[in-house]
C-alpha cells in the first residue's frame, strides 16, 4: 500500500514498515511506550487482534524474526499463515513475486516479508492493499530489528541519547547494523564508532545519514582502540552469504572477536548487544558476564513486535 501518515492519534495505524527512516523519533517513542505497556501487563493484550491474520513470506532464512512475529501475533489472539518452504510453494512452479504478494494480501491483514533483494519489501507494499512489514531486504533495511535494538538500549540504559556507541562487524553487507546506525541518527548519541575491517566499512549512504543529522562518528578497525569509551557495543556477524566473491570473505573471516579479555578494559556499565545469530564474533565466555545483554535483547522482540502489530492493525 506504501501508506502515508497514521491516524487515530497513532503514527503507525495502517502504515507499511519499510525503513527505519520512514519514522521519526517521536514515532519510535510512541512505539516504545506501547511496548512498555505490553511488558507490564501482557495478558491485557491477549485478545487485541482476535480475528486478524498475519502472513509471513520469508525468501531468506530466519529464526528469531519469523518466530517472534508469529509468537507476537498469537499472543495478541490473532492467527498466522506462512508461505513455508519455497520449493513446496507455487514459486517453485514459476509464480512471480507480485502474484505471491497478491495472494497473501487476499488471505491476511498484514504481510511480513523478507527477501534477498533490496527494494523487494517496498515493491510488495506497492502491490498489496494491506500493510507490509519489511523483515529484512537486501543489505540495507531491517526496520523492526532496528526498532528492537533501540528499544533494548532504552530499556537497559534508560535512554538512547547521550551514550557512546560502538557498532562492530560487517558494516558493508549487514542490514541489521546499517538499520541500527540509521536509527541512531534519529536520536542524540554522544558519539558513534564504526568498527570494522577495512574491507567491511560502512557504506557512504549510512555515514551520510549521520552527517545530515549532526551525529558525530569515527571509523576505526579494532574494538580494542575504543572499548574503554563505550556504553553500548553492538556486534554483528560477517554476512558470508552476501559476499559476491568467496575469496573476499576469506580475507576477513574471524578478523574480530569480542571476548572476556577485551571486556576487561570496558566500562562497568557497558552492554553488549547482537541481533543474532552469532557465529564466532562473540566468545562464549562473554555470556556469563554482566555485559552480555543479547539474549535479553532477543526476548524484548516479543513485546516490541506485539506493540507494533497492534498499532499497525488496530491503533
Swiss-Prot record:
PANTHER family: ASPARTATE CARBAMOYLTRANSFERASE (PTHR45753:SF6), ORNITHINE CARBAMOYLTRANSFERASE, MITOCHONDRIAL (PTHR45753)
Listed PROSITE patterns: CARBAMOYLTRANSFERASE
Name this polypeptide is given: Aspartate carbamoyltransferase catalytic subunit
GO biological process, any: 'de novo' UMP biosynthetic process
Organism: Thermofilum pendens (strain DSM 2475 / Hrk 5)
Top enzyme category: transferase
Pathway it works in: Pyrimidine metabolism; UMP biosynthesis via de novo pathway; (S)-dihydroorotate from bicarbonate: step 2/3
Oligomeric and partner information: Heterooligomer of catalytic and regulatory chains.
Binding site for L-aspartate: 93, 175, 237
Gene that specifies this protein: pyrB
UniProt keyword annotation of Transmembrane present: no
Phylogenetic lineage: Archaea, Thermoproteota, Thermoprotei, Thermofilales, Thermofilaceae
Family as reported in the entry's similarity comment: Belongs to the aspartate/ornithine carbamoyltransferase superfamily. ATCase family.
InterPro entries linked to this entry: Asp/Orn_carbamoyltranf_P-bd, Asp/Orn_carbamoylTrfase, Asp/Orn_carbamoylTrfase_sf, Asp_carbamoyltransf, Asp_carbamoyltransf_Asp/Orn-bd
Catalyzed reaction equations: carbamoyl phosphate + L-aspartate = N-carbamoyl-L-aspartate + phosphate + H(+)
UniProtKB keywords: Pyrimidine biosynthesis, Transferase
Listed EC numbers: 2.1.3.2
Residues that coordinate or bind carbamoyl phosphate: 64-65, 114, 142, 145, 276-277
Molecular-function GO terms, alphabetical: amino acid binding; aspartate carbamoyltransferase activity
Amino acid at each position: 500500500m506504501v501508506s502515508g501518515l497514521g491516524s487515530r492519534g497513532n503514527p503507525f495505524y495502517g502504515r507499511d514498515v519499510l525503513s527505519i527512516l520512514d519514522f521519526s523519533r517521536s514515532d519510535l517513542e510512541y512505539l516504545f511506550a506501547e511496548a512498555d505497556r505490553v511488558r507490564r501487563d501482557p495478558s491485557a493484550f491477549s485478545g487485541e487482534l482476535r480475528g486478524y491474520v498475519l502472513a509471513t513470506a520469508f525468501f531468506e532464512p530466519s529464526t528469531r524474526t519469523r518466530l517472534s512475529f508469529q509468537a507476537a501475533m498469537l499472543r495478541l489472539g490473532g492467527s498466522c499463515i506462512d508461505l513455508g518452504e519455497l520449493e513446496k510453494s507455487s514459486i517453485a512452479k514459476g509464480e512471480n513475486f507480485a502474484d505471491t504478494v497478491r495472494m497473501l494480501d487476499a488471505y491476511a491483514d498484514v504481510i511480513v516479508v523478507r527477501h534477498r533483494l533490496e527494494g523487494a519489501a517496498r515493491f510488495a507494499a506497492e502491490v498489496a492493499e494491506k500493510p507490509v512489514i519489511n523483515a529484512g531486504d537486501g543489505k540495507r533495511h531491517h526496520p523492526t530489528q532496528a526498532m528492537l535494538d533501540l528499544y533494548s538500549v532504552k530499556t537497559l540504559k534508560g535512554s538512547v541519547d547521550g551514550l557512546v556507541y560502538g557498532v562492530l562487524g560487517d558494516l558493508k553487507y549487514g542490514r541489521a547494523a546499517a538499520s541500527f546506525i540509521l536509527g541512531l541518527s534519529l536520536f542524540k548519541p554522544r558519539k558513534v564508532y564504526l568498527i570494522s575491517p577495512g574491507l567491511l566499512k560502512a557504506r557512504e549512504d549510512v555515514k551520510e545519514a549521520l552527517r545530515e543529522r549532526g551525529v558525530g562518528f569515527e571509523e576505526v578497525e579494532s574494538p580494542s582502540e575504543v572499548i574503554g569509551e563505550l556504553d553500548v557495543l553492538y556486534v554483528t556477524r560477517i554476512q558470508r552469504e552476501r559476499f559476491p566473491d568467496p575469496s573476499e570473505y576469506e580475507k576477513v573471516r574471524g578478523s574480530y572477536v569480542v571476548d572476556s579479555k577485551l571486556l576487561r578494559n570496558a566500562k562497568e556499565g557497558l552492554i553488549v548487544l547482537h541481533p543474532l545469530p552469532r557465529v564466532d564474533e562473540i566468545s562464549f565466555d562473554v555470556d556469563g558476564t554482566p555485559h552480555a545483554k543479547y539474549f535479553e535483547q532477543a526476548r524484548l522482540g516479543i513485546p516490541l513486535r506485539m506493540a507494533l502489530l497492534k498499532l499497525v492493525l488496530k491503533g
